[in-house]
């Protein structure tokens, strides 16, 4: 029997750009043809949609809670209008949020809009070292609050107890779905969820130590209208639709090849991106560093970077990546918000200038940076391809002249990610 999906099965709302790509990557790996929209799609996009899953990328992680809720509800309405059967709210595997939210408030609003009384919250991503045990989030062997995330310039995470963190962001009761229930399998999880619901719990942090735990959670939650978490929680969702006879049998990861120049743009200050920049510099490949203080002083940094790129024979790295200490020093002078905006805007302008000079393949490091770059390039829709590193797929833009992009969350990717991503975007091996 041939399965024809006139409408998407799974609708996803992500609170940042690279998080959306991370989730889309997971769904493609599971066999779902997936597209990612930058913001809520237009009517024109909706008319031509051919996907099993749609991921809407918002920029709602660090905005005011009221704004994040309004944007998320608008995205939910669009997804429901397309006929999506289940909704997934995606946030970072390190539970990135400000003291004011926004994970709890958005989850609460989505639950209410869907008329549901319960959902899970599980940011675990074991493949990338993010695990949850007794409600506490670990990054590799470190508690979240000791992992380096406590120094994040926008969303410092100083508490690893996710039940406590989430409860501070919502009026709804928060509980814990512990590892011992999950280890007993799908029916035990369903039974424990029923108990939690009976106790009035509306949001439950779910432990997860392995991918097997995530598959168990996915299967147990097949009938929940809403799921929330990191991309790892989506591991088991494609199989739910396949088991129900709703998923098409096709190569979900196929992408067209894109010819043209290439560049690496890095704005993240994370440990992983710092290591990736160091690897590039150690290989003595051409690189240009953006100085936020020079930007603030009105110097022609964008023009200088573009001139540098034009003069080089090989692929260049243009980066604002710095150590946490350097970032804090700049923020003391400029303020965190202004410093971030200056760098994002500059990298966006540089990306646009490079595109105009023939660059067609972009490797971008950092969630905020990726958002600025896709906006500057006027990318509205991405086809999602094969994985480069855990959480990071190759993508190609739809509409207009195609661009190949690898949009990486700051903390993702191995030390050799830049060269590996360039190789995959070019259609070969790094």
From Swiss-Prot:
Keywords: ATP-binding, Carbohydrate metabolism, Kinase, Nucleotide-binding, Transferase. The keyword Transferase applies. It catalyses: 3-dehydro-L-erythronate + ATP = 3-dehydro-4-O-phospho-L-erythronate + ADP + H(+); 3-dehydro-D-erythronate + ATP = 3-dehydro-4-O-phospho-D-erythronate + ADP + H(+). Pfam families: NBD_C, SBD_N. Transmembrane segments: none annotated. GO terms for molecular function: ATP binding; kinase activity. Gene3D superfamilies: Four-carbon acid sugar kinase, nucleotide binding domain (3.40.980.20), Putative sugar-binding, N-terminal domain (3.40.50.10840). InterPro entries: 4-carb_acid_sugar_kinase_N, 4-carb_acid_sugar_kinase_N_sf, NBD_C, NBD_C_sf, OtnK. Its EC number is 2.7.1.217. ATP binds at residues 268, 366-369, 410. Belongs to the four-carbon acid sugar kinase family. NCBIfam families: OxoTetrKin. Catalyzes the ATP-dependent phosphorylation of 3-oxo-tetronate to 3-oxo-tetronate 4-phosphate. This is 3-oxo-tetronate kinase. The gene is otnK.
């Amino acid at each position: 029997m041939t399965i024809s999906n006139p409408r998407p099965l799974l609708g996803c709302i992500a609170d940042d750009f690279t998080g959306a790509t991370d989730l889309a990557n997971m769904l493609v790996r599971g066999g779902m043809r997936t597209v990612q929209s930058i913001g809520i799609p237009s009517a024109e996009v909706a008319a031509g949609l051919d996907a099993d899953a749609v991921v809407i990328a918002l920029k709602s992680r660090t905005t005011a809670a009221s704004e994040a809720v309004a944007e998320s509800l608008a995205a939910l309405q669009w997804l429901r209008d397309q006929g999506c059967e289940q909704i997934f709210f995606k946030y970072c595997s390190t539970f990135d949020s400000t003291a004011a939210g926004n994970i709890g408030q958005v989850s609460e609003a989505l639950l209410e809009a869907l008329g549901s009384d319960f959902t899970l919250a599980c940011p675990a991503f074991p493949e990338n070292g993010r695990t949850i045990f007794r409600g506490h989030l670990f990054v590799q062997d470190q508690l979240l609050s000791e992992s380096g995330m406590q120094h994040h310039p926008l969303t410092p995470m100083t508490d690893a107890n996710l039940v406590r963190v989430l409860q501070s962001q919502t009026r709804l009761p928060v509980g814990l779905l512990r590892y011992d229930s999950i280890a007993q399998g799908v029916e035990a999880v369903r039974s424990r969820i029923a108990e939690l619901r009976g106790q009035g719990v509306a949001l439950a942090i779910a432990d997860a130590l392995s991918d097997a735990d995530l598959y168990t959670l996915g299967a147990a939650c097949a009938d929940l209208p809403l799921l929330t978490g990191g991309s790892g929680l989506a591991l088991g969702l494609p199989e739910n639709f396949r088991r129900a006879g709703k998923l098409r049998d096709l190569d979900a990861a196929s992408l067209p090849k894109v010819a043209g120049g290439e560049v690496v743009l890095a704005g993240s200050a994370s440990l992983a991106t710092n290591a990736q920049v160091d690897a590039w510099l150690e290989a003595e490949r051409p690189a240009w560093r953006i100085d936020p203080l020079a930007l603030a002083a009105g110097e022609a940094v964008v023009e200088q970077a573009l001139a540098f790129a034009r003069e080089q024979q090989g692929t260049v790295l243009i980066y604002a990546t710095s150590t946490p200490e350097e970032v804090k020093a700049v923020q003391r002078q400029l303020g965190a918000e202004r410093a971030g905006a200056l760098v994002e805007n500059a990298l966006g302008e540089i990306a646009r200038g490079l595109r105009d000079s023939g660059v067609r393949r972009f490797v971008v490091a950092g969630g905020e940076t990726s958002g600025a770059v896709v906006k500057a390039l006027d990318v509205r829709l991405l086809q999602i391809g094969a994985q480069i590193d855990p959480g990071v797929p190759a993508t190609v833009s739809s509409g207009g002249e195609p661009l190949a992009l690898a949009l990486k969350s700051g903390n993702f990717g191995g030390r050799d990610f830049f060269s590996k991503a360039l190789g995959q975007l070019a259609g070969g091996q790094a």
